[in-house]
Design a protein with these regions (language model features):
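N-proximal low-complexity "stem/linker" segments adjacent to membrane-targeting elements
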Residues: 1-69
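Juxtamembrane C-terminal module of membrane proteins
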Residues: 31-48, 287-302, 329-438
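Cell-envelope/extracellular polymer assembly enzymes that use nucleotide-activated donors
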Residues: 48-51, 81, 235
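Acidic helix N-cap motif at the loop->helix transition within catalytic regions
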Residues: 64, 91-99, 107, 116, ...
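Short, acidic, metal-binding catalytic loop of nucleotide-sugar glycosyltransferases
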Residues: 68-79
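A conserved acidic beta->alpha catalytic loop
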Residues: 86-94, 110-112, 145
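Acidic donor-binding/catalytic loop of UDP-sugar-dependent glycosyltransferases
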Residues: 92, 140-157
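Long helical/loop segments within the catalytic core of UDP-sugar-dependent glycosyltransferases
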Residues: 109, 113-130, 149-230, 267, ...
Length: 438
């Protein structure tokens, strides 16, 4: 009986594994094409006018780095205006902004609405009311630093008619510890194995964090910034897919931000992402599925956006369930003295070892693919690869925990790295990050 249970469990596992493998062919193709160089966008025929919006509550220790990088852009400065959003006039950020041209400080009035999305909505409505005309809005976090060609590269995409475009998200602190390097590696995966390939196949890309622009006519139609879930970036991506908004990704428009260095900070950050992901799916998935069925325009793009995650989730769930199945069965077998207990233990060790080895090799491939962008040392590369399976495995309890989190409070999180104009880093900075509360 014991052996039969193990045998049936194996059969079910291999069948589900095969099904998930077939359904993952599209993802595998994307990964392969992600290893090839990105396409270069042609030079723009016109320099367009942009507003750069920076939510910057209590960000006086980092805001200068971003404003300096904006000042040093290889772009017509008369076509750029920066809006820094604060909550109080006494914020030291306001004094720093006075040292820069074409920078306006906007003080929020409706502080009862907490969150980045509401801050963006206030300032954008203020801009619309002032009758200042901009063709698109760039969204940046205060701790970001832009490569000198960032806006020039993004302008190429806008000039080609893309209403939404994101740049290449790089990290300031690849060598800031295993948590920071694993976090940075996650964005490398999104950059290279997802958005690069999506752009190549003219699929809608997924915005991650900041470093993107959105055309002003979209926000004018909405009457402001209408994306106020916990993950406004993912919400924008979903909205653009639903409404057939043309989006792309430009690898050569590079910007930098800092990754968390402690597991606790990273946990809280990813907790917000997981909960926000659920919020957006709840808000948009029914509309997307309905659009897939009844709207012929970009039907395949929408179908892929909604359902492409299912094989991945299925593979993860199948592997976790089989691991738990063999672990429990092995313990029971050892307790009752079954002769088949060792084969079950061997199956458990094999599947856990295979998962670990897969993620180690996957991380190695990503680091090799991203070697031109990273400054990570060989030692830290090795540590990153060895620890990445634990980092990604932690998403499972994080996602489960997110289901029981209800309210959000914004708390300061210490950052330690600020980039100078020569690309070097120094230990200073703070940023705000959303932390879930039970």
């Amino acid at each position: 009986m014991y052996h039969q249970i193990f045998h049936v469990g194996n059969i079910i596992f291999y069948i589900l594994l095969a099904v998930c493998g077939v359904l993952l062919i599209q993802k595998i193709i994307y990964h392969i094409f992600g290893l090839f160089p990105s396409k270069r966008f042609p030079d723009a025929k016109k320099d367009h006018k942009y507003a750069i919006i920076i939510p910057a509550r209590n960000e006086s220790k980092v805001i200068a780095g971003l404003l300096d990088s904006i000042k040093n852009q290889n772009y017509n400065k008369d076509l750029l205006k920066t809006f820094v959003v604060v909550e109080q006039e006494s914020d030291p950020t306001c004094e720093i902004c006075k040292n820069y041209e074409n920078v306006e400080v906007f003080v929020r009035k409706h502080l009862e609405n907490k969150g980045k999305g509401y801050a963006l909505d206030e300032v954008i409505k203020h801009i619309f009311a002032s009758n200042e005309k901009y063709e698109a809005f760039f969204i940046c976090d205060a701790d970001n630093v832009l490569d000198k060609n960032f806006i020039m590269e993004m302008n190429k995409c806008f000039d080609m008619g893309y209403k939404l475009c994101l740049g290449y998200r790089n990290s300031k602190n690849w060598n800031g510890g295993w948590v920071a390097s694993c976090s940075a590696l996650t964005f490398s995966m999104i950059n290279t194995f997802q958005n690069k390939s999506k752009a190549r196949f003219n699929r809608n890309v997924v915005v991650s964090g900041t470093g993107f622009y959105i055309a002003s006519d979209i926000l004018e139609e909405l009457g402001g910034w209408d994306f106020c879930t916990l993950t406004e970036d993912y919400e924008i991506s979903t909205y653009s897919t639903l409404h057939n908004i043309k989006s792309t990704y430009n690898e050569y428009a590079e910007y930098y931000d800092e990754q968390p260095t402690s597991l606790k900070t990273s946990w809280n950050q990813r907790l917000r992402w997981c909960k926000g992901y659920s919020q957006v799916n709840k808000k948009y998935n029914k509309k997307l599925i309905k659009s897939v069925i009844f709207d012929r325009e970009k039907r395949l793009n929408k179908f892929e956006y909604v359902f492409s995650i299912l094989p991945v989730m299925g593979l993860i769930a199948t592997t976790i369930l089989y691991t738990l199945f063999t672990f429990v069965l092995a313990i029971v077998g050892s307790f009752i003295g079954s002769a088949y207990a060792w084969p079950v233990w061997r199956a458990f060790i094999t599947v856990v070892g295979a998962m670990y080895l897969f993620f180690v090799l996957y991380s190695m491939v990503m680091l090799i693919a991203e070697r031109k962008h990273t400054n990570i040392t060989m030692k830290n590369s090795l540590i990153c690869c060895l620890m990445s399976p634990f980092y990604w495995a932690s998403y499972v309890p994080i996602y489960v925990t997110a289901m029981f989190k209800r309210t959000v409070e914004w708390k300061p999180i210490i950052h330690k790295v600020q980039m100078s104009d020569d690309g070097k880093t120094s230990v200073e900075a703070t940023l705000e990050e959303g932390v879930e509360k039970k």
